[in-house]
């Protein structure tokens, strides 16, 4: 049994929360027979009408504005980046050009009308609309926010559409369905005047998220919601690819990359399928936070798992070199982060060695669905989940990577103290209500992660060793290197490497020397900086969301006087007065 005290519990619990990847719940603006609607966040829900025939109608602006949350700093600028303005007339033009149920496009003299647009979801990178047409057809329109470079958005859309096509043709079968893409454009040179994807709308379905309660009392209830995700996860693992990067249509990769078939067994497949897809540069965001040219080898594709792992260090060092050159970040923090990633570069090539993992299949190139989460799994609204067919949406964060680095989906990932029952905690009944709630939360998270792995072992036992404690420990530095939220998060990576060094022989059973070393001064500085960074994180409201507050929560906090607006237009947290 693990030792227990309140302080170590809170520390472990907080570290887990900071490492966890947050996923937000969508806001659904129900269409209630209105032709055009949106929500006005400051004053509560307000229906906004506009004429679909008047491009310059001022009321139309409200429909494109971001409403899902507020930033405590630079709110107006952050919202402006997420406006999704497009030409509604251009949308009608695109829909008119589509083949109708296998028939030719609509004749030029035939008028097609978009009768209603409804905002379904304002996500992290996209706004999602439902488009109703007067012939009864409904579509989903995805418009990316203007975040990152236009080139990065272009590659993401190209890869997302190709990946959806591949999964629909080669993976889904009768296990789940994938929206068909009817039209898309990865540039702004099109009738909508923006990058977009137009695809199937699945009527009568809910997100699995509506049924998911991560702390539901009955584990069987949670397991029933985890199993659909496991079924999809295991299906996506089945195709083996020839390289590491991201999927594209053949015409969207370089001639060099077009010469290599995308997946194992393609030479025996139908020619039109074998020639359809190729592996090109990865679309993982860490590789695009720079000004590298489109064909930079630092973004892949890579021939081996080892090359990919080494690239996770090389790209971070390149990004930091650009930051140092630009001079717009704290030089001391950039220098400290560079020192951390230089040590990580020494470690990366020595972390996961094939003879020590003892399962070469875990190094094979497989599909990782970065946003595999109940919010992106749709179930039939009128059926029990166990009997419902599944639909998978939102493929933007999908890449081809070593199987052992795909890992647990973020919504059930847990890196804190493992607790399975309250009996594991001495004197549980004597804890405060707050500590009991935290213990219960950790028990639920432990059970969720265990349940995912247990169910996956039933579906895809050949990959279960990716989740062994040893492989997970060795993979963790790679995960941290690819997913920092702040520049200072290099301290988390450094802390993880130091802990791994300490456990290298006694816990991990390694016979070879740990590849990286620290001086006593470096140990002391890391301990001091890490403690200060944790303290800042613990004392900063909405730290994990970088100051973003869900709109309903913002309105409640502001209305209750817990947030105050400054002269600069920013918001500050006002702690409640002690009675």
UniProtKB/Swiss-Prot annotation:
GO cellular component, one term: mitochondrion
Keywords from the UniProt entry: Mitochondrion, Transit peptide
Source organism superkingdom: Eukaryota
Record bears the keyword Mitochondrion: yes
Entry-linked InterPro entries: Kinase-like_dom_sf, Mito_inheritance_9
Mitochondrion in keyword set: yes
Localization per Swiss-Prot or TrEMBL: Mitochondrion
Transit peptide segment: 1-36
UniProt similarity note: Belongs to the AIM9 family.
UniProt name for this protein: Altered inheritance of mitochondria protein 9, mitochondrial
Taxonomic source organism: Yarrowia lipolytica (strain CLIB 122 / E 150)
Gene that encodes the chain: AIM9
């Amino acid at each position: 049994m693990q030792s227990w005290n309140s302080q170590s519990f809170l520390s472990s619990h907080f570290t887990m929360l900071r490492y966890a990847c947050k996923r937000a719940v969508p806001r659904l603006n129900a269409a209630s027979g209105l032709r055009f609607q949106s929500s006005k966040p400051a004053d509560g829900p307000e229906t906004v009408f506009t004429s679909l025939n008047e491009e310059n109608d001022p009321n139309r602006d409200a429909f494109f504005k971001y409403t899902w949350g507020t930033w405590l700093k630079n709110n107006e600028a952050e919202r402006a980046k997420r406006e999704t303005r497009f030409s509604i007339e251009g949308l009608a033009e695109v829909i008119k050009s589509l083949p109708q149920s296998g028939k030719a496009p609509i004749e030029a003299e035939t008028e097609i009308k978009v009768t209603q647009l409804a905002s379904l979801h304002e996500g992290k990178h996209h706004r999602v609309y439902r488009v109703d047409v007067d012939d009864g057809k409904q579509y989903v329109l995805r418009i990316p926010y203007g975040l990152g470079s236009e080139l990065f958005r272009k590659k993401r859309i190209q890869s997302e559409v190709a990946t959806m096509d591949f999964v629909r043709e080669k993976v889904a079968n009768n296990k789940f369905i994938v929206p068909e893409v009817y039209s898309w454009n990865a540039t702004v040179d099109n009738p909508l005047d923006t990058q977009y994807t137009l695809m199937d709308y699945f009527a009568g379905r809910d997100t699995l998220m509506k049924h998911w309660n991560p702390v539901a009392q009955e584990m069987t209830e949670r397991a029933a919601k985890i199993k659909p995700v496991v079924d999809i996860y295991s299906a996506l693992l089945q195709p083996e690819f020839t390289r590491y990067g991201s999927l594209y249509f053949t015409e969207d990769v370089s001639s060099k990359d077009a010469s290599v078939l995308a997946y194992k067994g393609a030479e025996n497949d139908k020619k039109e399928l074998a020639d359809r897809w190729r592996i090109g540069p990865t679309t993982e965001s860490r590789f695009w936070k720079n000004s590298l040219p489109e064909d930079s080898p630092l973004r892949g594709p890579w021939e081996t798992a080892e090359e990919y792992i080494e690239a996770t260090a090389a790209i971070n060092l390149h990004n930091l070199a650009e930051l140092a050159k630009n001079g717009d970040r704290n030089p001391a923090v950039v220098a400290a982060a560079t020192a951390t990633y230089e040590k990580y570069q020494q470690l990366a090539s020595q972390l996961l060695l094939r003879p020590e993992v003892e399962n070469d299949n875990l190094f094979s190139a497989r599909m990782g669905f970065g946003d595999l989460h109940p919010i992106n799994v749709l179930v039939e609204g009128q059926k029990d989940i166990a009997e419902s067919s599944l639909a998978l949406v939102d493929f933007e964060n999908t890449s081809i990577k070593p199987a052992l680095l795909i890992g647990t989906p973020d919504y059930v990932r847990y890196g804190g103290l493992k607790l399975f029952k309250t009996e594991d905690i001495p004197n549980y009944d004597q804890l405060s209500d707050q500590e009991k709630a935290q213990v219960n939360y950790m028990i639920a998270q432990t059970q969720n992660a265990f349940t995912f792995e247990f169910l996956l072992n039933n579906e895809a036992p050949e990959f279960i060793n990716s989740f062994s404690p040893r492989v997970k420990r060795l993979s963790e530095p790679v995960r941290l290197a690819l997913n920092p939220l702040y520049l200072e998060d290099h301290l988390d990576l450094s802390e993880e490497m130091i802990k791994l060094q300490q456990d290298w022989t006694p816990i991990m059973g390694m016979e070879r020397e740990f590849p990286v070393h620290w001086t006593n001064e470096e140990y002391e500085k890391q301990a001091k900086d890490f403690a200060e960074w944790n303290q800042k994180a613990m004392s900063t409201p909405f730290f994990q969301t970088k100051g973003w507050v869900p709109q309903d929560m913002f309105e409640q906090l502001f209305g209750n006087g817990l947030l105050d607006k400054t002269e600069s237009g920013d918001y500050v947290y006002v702690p409640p007065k002690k009675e």
